[in-house]
Structures are given as C-alpha cells and as structure tokens.
C-alpha cells in the first residue's frame, strides 16, 4: 500500500479496512482516484473464479460466494477487514475482536480478545495488533497467541504496523509518537512529543518516519522536520522548515525553508528554486510543477527545467488541474482574453514538452486523469442540472452522474439519468461504455462496485426510512443480472481494481 502524509488524526492503515458505518455513508464506488490507494484502472490482480465479496445488512456482515450467501457475524460490526486474498475476515462486534477463515468452510468465528476499541492487521491477516479499552496494545495471531507490546495508547485510530508486525507505531496520551520494535522486546526506537496539528508520514515497512512538528514562537506558527531512517538509527532535523510533499518510501521530500524550495533525499538537501514556497507534486514520484504566466518550472528530484508556454493574450491565467501519480502527465487550463482551454503536458523524459490542447474549458466542473492518462471531465449547460462526460475531448455520455464513475481496463461505468431528470427515460441506469458503445445494465441503481468487467455488484431501490437505509443487492455476471439479497445497506470487496472518478464540482468545496 502506498503511504501518504496524514494529519495525526488520520494515519494510514496498512490493509484495506473500512468502517461499515463509513461504507454505508459513502456513495459507493469505493475509493480511488484519491491517490495513494492499492488500486488502479488496469491492476494485475485477478478476481477469483468464484466471485466473493462482503456486504452488510444493518451492520451485520454477510458473504456472497459463488451463488450462495452466508451470515458471517452474529451481531452488529463496527469495523471489519477482508484480507487482500479474500480468504480471511477480521471484525469487531460489540467490543469483541473476531477472526474467521473463510476459505475453510468448516471453520467457525474465533474470538481473539474482548474490550477492543481498534485493530490493525497485516496483508494476509495472520498477525493482528489491537488496542484495549485501557490503552494497552497487544499483538495476536490467528492461533490465539497474544503478547502485550505497548500501553497508554491515546486514540483508537492511531495504530499502524508493518507487514511482518515486528514494528508498530502509535500515539500516547501525552501526544508522543512512539515507534516500537516488537521483535526486540518492544524497544522504543522513536519517541517524539508532538502537537495535534503535526503530521506523520511513514514508509510501509516503518523503516522511514517523517514528522513535521508544529509549534508557536511569539504567537507565530513555526515547524521543524524530523526524519528517522534505517529503523530509527539515523535522525535528521531540518529546523524552521515546512514540508511540501513527503515520499517516505524513498526517504525524500520537497520542503521550504527561508522562502526557498528544497529537495531532500537520504540526508542530503539541494535548493531547487529561490523565492518559492509551493508547487504541485505527484503522489508516487518526486516530481514538482510550478505554473506561471510564461510556462512551467519542473523539478525531478534535484534536476530542474523551464518549459515555455505562450498564449496570445493580454493576460494569461494558468490553473493546475491534475498531475499523474508517476509525475509524467500534467493537466492544466489556460485562459486569456475570454478564451480558456484544457491542455495536456507530457513531462516524461525525452518528450518534446509541448502542451497539447484537448478541449475548450467552458462550463467544466472538474478534470481528472485515469490510471492510463486519459483526461476525464464533465460539462454542464447553463441553467441545467444535467451533466455530460467527456474523455480526451470526446463526448462519451449525456445526462450522467458525474460524481459516480468507475474506469477499468478501457471501460467506463456510470449512472445515466440520475435523479430522473429525463422523465421519458428510466432513471438511475447503470451503464458500461466500451470504445464509445453504451450498454445499459440495470435501472434504479443507487450504488455499485466493479469486481471485474464480468462481475458488478449493485444496490437498487434504496430506501431511507427512520434508522434504516437499504435496498436489493444484485450481481451482474457474464451478461446476466441475478438477485442476491434484500435490505442490504453496503457492499465491500478486498481489492478494488478500478479508478474511482469524482467529477462533482461541490466535492471540491
């Protein structure tokens, strides 16, 4: 899983693990394009031959497995984890932590511990770290063995581990960040007192920790950067500096100090631009772009270049819209004298670095990129609630829900005639668009999740009554739609291969 910088209230978990409450509240095409997830529009992950997924009915877990549904939890679940191979289920129910081997049909749920407020697990679910109500932290295995590995943990969301579970990170009640080596009798290798506004970024194996500590000097905000590497053996401090983007997997970052922009990597810092304190950064690779009226400044680690861009206008305004995770594609809009267009700029090594116009930027709500660099955006007609979806300058869908789109292996999935604005057509029709050809799957769809091109889950006819919200669950498989269950509130799968695309203007506010 890709790491990213988080405020300490939202530290990253290391496997796909969602609150059932949160899943029920989200418009369910689950996760992505908010980068940093496990998924991509063309992942190498292969779905099991027999589709398997978890769904919830009023927070009670069920599993669909090749034509049959089975109740998995006896009671309401506050949080659950389906491992990436879809073979193990871990969940909390009324304070009890449970484990179940799904692959073993004869296996029953095993209670791991009581009075548990939160947990985290490694990718295959074989090692679990959990917090008790009194703040004690335990490490457990699926065979029932447990050991205490920490104490005085302050917040049930602030617990993370590496995949071997021999290092754990957490915050204490006095707001100290602790990184402990469980394999060495819980030896504390990082102990930093930080404020509530500080940030922590960590590599997946927890060998690199980057902390930005905020504080005040004479009522003025300030910050220092602490970098721990080599499992805490090396400590570097950059005083009076602010992180622009951290890349803990690479032990690197962009930061600003004394009004200039720097690149740091493995203990060494290089100034990349004078009199500059910000830039748009790629999520996975250390690429930074700064736009201006005459072009772009691009930094790739400590290497920089200027890219000229001229627009015949008395005044030019350039607005960054998206930079790809790998830093090779940059999307922007440029306007001058009343004209505005969407441009794509290829930043990859060896390209001619010439921006290419894609479309007029008129009534565009939001622009984003798919994993294979297609430019997706929506447009509205003035005074109309209907939205049309465009890809690389071509109209692919009219009257579509632009904040509920998925993309997988060249096909787009979206809901047409959302809210029934066109009274002559069926409402909320889930549609697949492949090479410009639309295929209607089913109407009255409220939520959906793409397992693969031949397997799509849908909740239809969603009802909202008092404390209940739910609908009928269907599976679209190999061209046929099959009813699975009723009164279903949410659906989940362990690995999402698709891009989640949100073009809703209001989601940006």
Segments (PLM) and residue ranges:
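N-terminal Lys/Arg-rich, disordered targeting/topogenic segments
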Residues: 1-11
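Sequence signature of WD/YWTD-type beta-propeller architectures
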Residues: 10-509
């Amino acid at each position: 899983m890709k790491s990213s910088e988080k405020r300490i209230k939202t530290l990253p978990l290391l496997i796909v693990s969602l609150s059932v409450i949160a899943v029920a509240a989200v418009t369910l095409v689950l996760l992505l394009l908010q980068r940093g997830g496990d998924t991509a529009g063309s992942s190498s992950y292969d779905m099991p031959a027999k589709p398997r997924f978890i769904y919830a009915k009023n927070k009670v877990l069920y599993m669909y497995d090749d034509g049959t549904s089975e109740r998995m939890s006896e009671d309401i679940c506050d949080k659950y984890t389906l491992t990436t191979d879809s073979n193990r289920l871990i969940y909390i129910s009324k304070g009890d932590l449970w484990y179940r081997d799904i692959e073993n049909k004869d296996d029953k749920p095993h209670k791991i511990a009581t009075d548990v407020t939160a947990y985290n697990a490694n990718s295959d679910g074989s090692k679990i770290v959990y917090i008790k109500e009194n703040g004690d932290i335990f490490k457990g295995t699926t065979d029932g063995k447990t050991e205490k590995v920490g104490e005085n943990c302050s917040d049930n969301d602030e617990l993370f581990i590496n995949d071997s579970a021999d290092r754990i990170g957490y915050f204490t009640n006095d707001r100290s960040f602790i990184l402990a080596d469980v394999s060495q009798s819980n030896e504390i290798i990082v102990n930093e007192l930080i404020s509530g506004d500080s940030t922590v970024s960590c590599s997946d194996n927890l060998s690199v920790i980057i902390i930005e500590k905020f504080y005040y000097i004479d009522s003025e905000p300030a910050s220092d950067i602490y970098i721990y590497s080599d499992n805490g053996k090396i400590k570097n401090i950059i005083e009076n500096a602010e992180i622009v983007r951290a890349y803990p997997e690479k032990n690197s970052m962009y930061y600003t100090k004394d009004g200039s922009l720097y690149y740091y990597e493995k203990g060494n810092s290089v100034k990349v631009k004078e009199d500059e304190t910000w830039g748009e950064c790629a999520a996975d690779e250390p690429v930074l772009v700064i736009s201006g009226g005459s072009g772009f400044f691009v930094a790739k680690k400590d290497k920089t270049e200027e890219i000229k861009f001229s627009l015949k206008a008395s005044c030019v305004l350039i607005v960054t819209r998206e930079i790809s995770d790998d830093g090779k594609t940059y999307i922007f809009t440029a306007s001058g004298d009343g004209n505005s267009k969407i441009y794509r700029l290829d930043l990859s090594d060896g390209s001619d670095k010439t921006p290419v116009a894609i479309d007029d930027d008129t009534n565009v709500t939001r622009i984003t990129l798919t994993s294979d660099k297609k430019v997706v955006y929506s447009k509205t007609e003035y005074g109309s609630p209907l939205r049309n979806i465009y890809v690389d300058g071509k109209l692919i869908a009219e009257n579509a829900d632009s904040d509920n789109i998925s993309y997988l292996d060249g096909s787009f999935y979206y809901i047409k005639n959302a809210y029934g604005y066109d009274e002559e057509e069926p409402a909320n029709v889930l549609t697949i668009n492949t090479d410009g050809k639309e295929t209607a799957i089913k109407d009255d769809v409220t939520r959906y999740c793409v397992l693969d091109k031949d397997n799509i889950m849908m909740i239809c006819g969603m009802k909202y009554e008092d404390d209940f919200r739910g609908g009928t669950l269907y599976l679209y498989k190999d061209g046929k739609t099959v009813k699975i269950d009723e009164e279903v509130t949410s659906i989940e799968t362990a690995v999402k291969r698709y891009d989640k695309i949100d073009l809703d203007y209001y989601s940006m506010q």
